[in-house]
Amino acid sequence: MFGRRSMADPPAPPAIILAGGLAQRMGGGDKALRMVGGRTLLALVIDRLASQCDILALSANGDPARFADYDLPVIADPVDGFRGPLAGVLAGLDWVAEHRPAARWMLSTPADCPFLPRDLVARLHQARIDQQADIAVAASAGRSHPVIALWPVGLRIDLRRALLADDIRKVDRFTARYPRAMAEWPVEPADPFFNANTPQDLAEAEGLAMREPD
C-alpha cells in the first residue's frame, strides 16, 4: 500500500528521536540527558544515527531550550495528553511531511538506546523490501523493539485517527494493522538495542561503553 516493493528509496531517511518519556524509574527528568561514558544518552544516539539519516529531529514536550546544545528541531506532540511514543511518531511524520516533502520513509528510535547498530537504516529498508511490508521493526533475541522502526510518511493520517478516534497508545497494537517486517540483530557481544531505563541500566551501559569498539 505504501510502495513496499520499491528499490529506489533514498538511503538516508529523516529520523525522529523519541525523548518524551516520563523516566519514572530514574526519578523523573530527561532520561536522554543522563550520562554514559562522559556523554549523554542523546549524544550517543545522535552519533549512531547521523551518518545513516538525512536529518534528525527530537520529539519532546516542555521547554525546548534544554536541548539547545544539540542543534536539533524539537517537536512537541501534536495531540493533547500523554499518549506515549505513538504521539512522538506522529509528531515526526507530520514534521517530515512539512520539512522533507520528498521523503517517503522516516526512522524512529528512542533516546535511551546508546548502542544502536550503524547498519540500522540499511537493514530495516532491506527487510521491508524482502518481506513486502509497510513497516519495518528492529528485533533482537527473538523480541521486537516496536519504536525502533521505519515508517511510511503516508501513514500519518491513519495514525492520527488511531490516536484521536480509537485511543490506541500501544505501538504494537497500531502496527499490527499493517504488514510488518522484522529485521533481527545478534545480541553478541552485546544487544545493540540495550536501553537504559533505570540507574542500574546506566551503570551497565557504562561497562558496555568501555567495551564498544566504535
Curated annotation (Swiss-Prot):
MF GO annotations: GTP binding; metal ion binding; molybdenum cofactor guanylyltransferase activity
EC code: 2.7.7.77
Binding residues annotated for Mg(2+), in chain numbering: D112
Record's keyword terms, sorted: Cytoplasm, GTP-binding, Magnesium, Metal-binding, Molybdenum cofactor biosynthesis, Nucleotide-binding, Transferase
Coiled-coil stretches: none
Location in the cell: Cytoplasm
Family: Belongs to the MobA family.
Subunit structure comment from the entry: Monomer.
UniProt-listed HAMAP family: MobA
Name of this protein: Molybdenum cofactor guanylyltransferase
Originating organism: Rhodopseudomonas palustris (strain HaA2)
